[in-house]
Amino acid sequence: MRRLLALALLLPIVGGQGGARAEPQQMVAAAHPLAVEAGLDVLRRGGSAVDAAVAVQMMLGVVEPHSSGIGGGGFLLYYDAGTRGIAVYDGREAAPAGATPTMFLHDGRPLPFLDAVASGLSVGVPGAVALLEMAHREHGKLPWADLFTSSIGVARKGFPVSPRLAFWLETIKRLGSEPAARTIYFNEDGSPKKTGERIANPALAGTMERIAAEGARVLREGPIAEEMAARVRGHERPGTLAAADLAAYKPVKREPLCGPYRIWIVCGMPPPSSGGIAILQMLGLLEPFDLRKDKPNDLRALHLIAEAGRLAFADRARYVADPAFVAVPTRQLVAPGYIAERRKLISEDKSMGEQGPVAPGYVEHGTSHMTIVDRAGNAVAFTTTIEGPFGAQMMVGGFILNNELTDFSEVAERDGKPVANRVGPGKRPRSSMSPTFVLDRERKLVLSVGSAGGQRIIGDTLQALVGMLDWNLSAQAALDLPRVANMNGPTELEDKGDLPAQADALRKLGHQVQVRRHEGGLTAVRRKGDGWEGGADPRRDGVAKGE
């Protein structure tokens, strides 16, 4: 473990800085140095990009437990360099069979959001491990059990608390009321662990040892599954999760959602994620305005990006949900003719204001994204989550349970019509996760990108794409950009650099502007010469490293 930590501390924070040396032929970008080193260790041993993703996820569950882990879910894109095809894996959490459209109401009114989060009501059936098991079965090279060695070692021996983990432990102090979490993340006097203090999680090490030996069925049946169900049903605000729900869960393979942007093909996640639709819509809306004429942070670019986001989020709220329950008009929403009609609503001189259904205003700070390319050129873009910081704030087997069901709409009807994203038994809640590949016209991989950050994922990923494709920025420079976003409400400007200085000019165009802190969570890998460069969001603890 000491060797792993020492190597991780030497990792450069940006990719592609190598001067005259050959560009890296394999790359890992993730939210923590130890996770990056775990992935690289697998690649050095001849593992595939999917093998590395398993190792990275397991390590993130140890060192970034506030964002993702065994108790959550995610979406994974896999690029096969040999066939130039894309496989899509949906490991989104699902509502239990006992879920109802009114479960988040109390006396006919929505529960306070944070009360719903920290409750048994919010916990969905986790799917991250099942997703990884399916992807590994199809694209793994190393034995499944060999991919857990690094994370088990760190969980047993301990690791220093990162600045971001320390921040969220200080912020979510109610986590200390969970006995299992208190013994791991808090001191004897009840104070949260601080940056640099050491944490070990032997319970999680034991759970991972079982998963390494037996696979995802450990979470579907047996003692851990039974404990999950009992913990959720025994909460003071109980949910309905049952052992039968865990046993019935299956990840889903889907078709990628792809569309053109200038000379490239952009591919993302279809529903129940809204990310693929929204990003293709926004790129289609923006293409005729030719953002190459602008510089980053120019008023025109900020205005147009915000207006495109406004329209995409209006459609997201109205149409997008789990396609097993709702007929989502996916192809119509990204059709050139439809996008051209929507584009008529955009003026370069004035904001259009709110359009149709408005997205809820809660900002989610959880989730993690990894970007991996192996030596053969195969790639993974994997967005993984337990939803909010520390999910539902409950622990079983050393891992945090998700609060993913709060991604459903609170109300079942609006204006007398069913809401697409209403709660339903077995249904997967709508997501904003946006793992994205960009290919050239020969379907060779150009870049891979994705982000954490709840609904802000879509705008952050879009802005990174614009930075790399339109402004020809390096992967790291694109991720460093100050952020602008509009989710069919106020236009949000990050309180960074010279971006806040544009607030008054945007207000003159009719925008309601909020200047606020932003966490981000992007990672990216981009082709450079005969190799790759990488980037990791400077707002978090992550790095990108290639060899």
Language-model regions, residue ranges each:
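Bacterial N-terminal signal peptides
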Residues: 5-16
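Noncatalytic scaffold domains of N-terminal-nucleophile
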Residues: 21-37, 41, 49-214, 219-221, ...
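Active-site rim segments in enzyme catalytic domains, especially the processed small/beta chain
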Residues: 62-69, 73-88, 105, 239-242, ...
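Short, small/polar residue-rich loop motifs at catalytic or cofactor-binding pockets
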Residues: 253, 364-367, 431-433
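Glycine-rich phosphate/pyrophosphate-binding beta-alpha loops
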Residues: 267-276, 368-371, 381-393, 451-458
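Internal maturation/activation junctions in enzymes
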Residues: 288-385, 537
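Extended C-terminal subregions enriched in glycine
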Residues: 426-428, 461, 470-517
